[in-house]
């Protein structure tokens, strides 16, 4: 389970932001940290919900793990 973990992205990585009925591709640049909020779920092992800055995105779990490096979270959060 990746929930609660933080990853420093070493390469630009694509995420999807869902706003109402619309989905928008968002490129998260290398050097940014994403926090896994949820996932992957047993019925969908491919996607995770992440927080990046003030956005909530859906990303491919494999992309986050292969293009990122797990780092400690903010103090008190792991």
Stretches with model-predicted labels:
Residues 1-42:
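Beta-loop motif signature
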Residues 32-61:
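SH3/SH3-like beta-barrel superfamily modules
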Residues 51-78:
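Boundary regions of SH3-family modules and the immediately adjacent low-complexity/disordered segments
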């Amino acid at each position: 389970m990746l929930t609660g973990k933080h990853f420093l992205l070493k390469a630009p990585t694509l995420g999807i932001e869902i706003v109402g009925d619309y989905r928008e591709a968002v490129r998260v640049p290398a050097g940014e940290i994403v926090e896994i909020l949820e996932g992957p779920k047993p019925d969908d092992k491919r996607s995770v919900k992440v927080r990046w800055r003030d956005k909530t995105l859906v990303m491919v779990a494999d992309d986050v793990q292969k293009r990122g490096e797990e780092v400690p979270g903010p103090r008190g959060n792991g």
